[in-house]
């Protein structure tokens, strides 16, 4: 039976939470949520076309990599980044969870056929929750096998948090990196509730329990608490990128969450190399192939082209 998207659940992740996301990502989520939450949009119930918890799965039945070019494992990191898997509807944008990416990396690390790992990144970011944990996992494993962040073509905010933790960051000239910052929006609907005749009475214990409620304007205490959470999330992002990239924290903070083109990202120390994603993947596949059986390198390059066209 078809199921509607759980919009209240999505709203709880989009509003009142620190996000490592660009303004465009947040605007896109709001354009999906707000009309539906206010009853101004009718959904096409097509959620049954995709199974619960659906995500792209480059795993073979026996736990080995499907998206593999010889000794090279390619893991897509696309769309809005979330902490855990959830329902996906055909009206939604592409979603990828941190736990799913970690699972793919773990599988690639355990696969003896895989010599190097590539994260194929095209994302404007997403949730702050879970992002640091994935980045730390990547950072701790890059000494086991090289992990390259191939920015194809965007690695902003949470996506850049992940990319920075990799062994190497490669970006195209027309691609971009950055947005090292945090954003949060609070949705207050008390005036709308008055207009439609809704009244909510909240019973609670603990003075801070209803901080951030959408049914009334933010109190000074609630705003102070939000500012504290934002400072924590921002400082964590800045200090982590500085450690991963070997940069002074002041230099990372001085970017002021700007979005940089490929060449600007390299110049500012956020990326290591400027390259066409297709060409880089082909060359890396050939290099990995040459470490084992040089005569197969042409075949691996052809496989790289085929795989890249699927990403």
Predicted regions and their residues:
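N-terminal organellar transit peptides
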Residues: 1-311
């Amino acid at each position: 039976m078809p199921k509607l998207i759980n919009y209240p659940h999505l709203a709880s992740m989009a509003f009142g939470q620190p996000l490592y996301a660009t303004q465009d990502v947040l605007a896109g989520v709001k354009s999906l949520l707000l009309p539906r939450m206010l009853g101004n949009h009718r959904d096409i119930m097509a959620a049954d076309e995709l199974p619960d918890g659906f995500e792209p799965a480059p795993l073979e039945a026996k736990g080995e990599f499907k998206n593999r070019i010889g000794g090279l494992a390619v893991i897509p990191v696309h769309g809005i980044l979330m902490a855990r898997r959830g329902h996906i509807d055909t009206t939604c944008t592409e979603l990828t969870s941190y736990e799913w990416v970690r699972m793919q990396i773990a599988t690639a690390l355990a696969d003896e056929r895989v010599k190097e790992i590539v994260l194929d990144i095209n994302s404007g970011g997403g949730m702050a929750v879970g992002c640091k944990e994935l980045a730390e996992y990547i950072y701790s494993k890059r000494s086991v096998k090289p992990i390259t962040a191939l920015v194809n073509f965007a690695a902003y905010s949470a996506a850049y948090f992940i990319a920075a933790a990799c062994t190497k960051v490669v970006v195209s000239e027309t691609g971009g990196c950055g947005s090292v910052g945090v954003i949060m929006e609070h949705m207050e609907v008390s005036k709308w509730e008055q207009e439609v005749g809704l009244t909510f009475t909240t019973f609670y214990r603990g003075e801070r329990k209803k901080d951030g409620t959408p049914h009334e304007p933010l109190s000074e205490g609630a705003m102070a608490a939000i500012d504290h959470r934002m400072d924590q999330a921002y400082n964590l992002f800045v200090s982590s990128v500085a450690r991963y990239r070997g940069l002074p924290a002041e230099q990372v903070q001085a970017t002021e969450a700007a979005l940089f083109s490929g060449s600007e990202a390299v110049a500012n120390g956020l990326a290591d190399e400027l390259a066409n994603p297709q060409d880089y993947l082909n060359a890396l596949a050939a290099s990995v192939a040459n470490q084992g059986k040089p005569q197969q390198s042409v075949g691996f390059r052809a496989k790289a082209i085929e795989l890249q066209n699927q990403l």
